[in-house]
Regions:
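Jelly-roll (double-stranded beta-helix
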Residues: 1-222
Length: 222
């Protein structure tokens, strides 16, 4: 397993696909074919929404967004597909096939984005609240090949409960991301133990998995 700790300085700024906004790319999973075509298997990013505008369309993809800060936005994807995102840290899943218009409630806001090619991946997004000293243990699905922990509030200590206690834990600060990526040669850890560092802590836990996982196990389908 490969573990990478990223700070906001590592996130790559880029324009939205439709050119109407800005996103900071945290991680993207691409093959050589994707590099040539501009596609991807999965992507994690933070978008800054400064004005109301249409969202970029991602045909064949499932999306999950989480409001990080600001008053929020209203999303209109057609009849029966309206959603108000005004409460931070509440995941909302919808289809990238939809034409979605965004109206800001009051001023700019930011949101965390998970996008997966539904033919090649599924995503699960959970919000985890921690209070010291009680830790939480995260357990992998057999289909998981990437985990990401993004700290929404506070700071977290992350360790492998199956390793000797002498193994040093990792400290993950607010808006930093811990990526844990498995491969055939080095599978993903089955468990992670997460604790709050000194105060109330809130995390986004994102799992990217192969499509063999059932829809009931994922949060990616609208």
């Amino acid at each position: 397993m490969r573990t990478t700790l990223l700070s906001p300085a590592d996130y790559r700024p880029m324009p939205w696909k439709n050119g109407l906004g800005t996103t900071h790319e945290i991680w993207v999973g691409r093959t050589a074919h994707d590099e040539a075509t501009g596609g991807f298997r999965a992507r994690l990013s933070i978008a800054t929404v400064s004005v109301g505008s249409p969202f970029s369309r991602f045909a064949g993809c499932d999306r999950i967004i989480v409001l990080l800060d600001g008053a929020g936005m209203r999303l209109d994807s057609g009849p029966g597909r309206q959603q108000v995102l005004s409460q931070p840290h509440q995941p909302y899943a919808f289809s990238g096939d939809w034409d979605t218009d965004c109206t800001l409630i009051e001023g700019p806001c930011r949101d965390f984005n998970v996008i997966v090619d539904r033919q090649r991946a599924r995503a699960e997004v959970r919000v985890i609240s921690l209070s010291p000293p009680q830790p939480a243990t995260l357990t992998a699905s057999p289909q998981d090949d990437l985990w990401a922990l993004f700290v929404l509030q506070g700071a977290a200590t992350v360790s492998d409960p199956d390793q000797p206690p002498t193994s040093p834990p990792l400290s993950v600060q607010r808006e930093h991301t811990l990526l844990c990526q498995g491969s055939e040669q080095a599978p993903l850890l089955r468990r992670l133990q997460v604790s709050a560092e000194g105060g109330e802590t809130r995390l986004l836990w994102i799992a990217i998995r192969t499509p063999e996982a059932t829809a009931a196990d994922t949060g990616a389908r609208p």
